[in-house]
């Protein structure tokens, strides 16, 4: 089985770490390049356990020139990049009245522009090499639904989904696939603090979710793994929701 080279951003914890670990564990042909703003003990364990199959770069994704150089280095070392899971992002929780335009710019710069930068670089590289590429953006149900105090995050995710749809149509003939995976509330690294510090809001999210619980990072990783796999050969320009039924209401 030939190597499949993939990038996972925001790989240090939560959904990003669960995806990285699953891809390494499930298929020996997967070579994963992790990009995250910081390292940790869990990533060190992956480096020890998987050796050359896991390579880590420390970078914020909004360091756009640095990320471009990383992608070039990966391609020079491994060859063409087959897939990318763009998971890294930030959120802010402020009402619209208290969210100035600079905050909107900051969130959009990380969640939207930085991911467009990665996608454009991969598309251009693979067009040059006449190779397909599968790009998956981790979005959010917030991009499609209205939420109090999350307008900055919502704008960034809905804009990212708009780019995804247009790029998917534009490059489908070149065997480029672009999709979004939009989780609901997930038990990632912030979950315990959220339950403790925002109990009323946590209870509300449970009441809004038909399945009556938050999702698990591993559940999102399962879907992401399929969406960038060779088994997924006909899906592009689509947002898949994994939210316990929230958006079905």
Label each residue range with its predicted role.
Residues 12-13:
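Conserved glycine-rich cofactor-binding loop
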Residues 95-96, 100-108, 205:
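Substrate-binding pocket helix/loop in short-chain dehydrogenase/reductase
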Residues 124, 169-173, 233:
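Alpha-helical segment proximal to the catalytic Tyr-Lys
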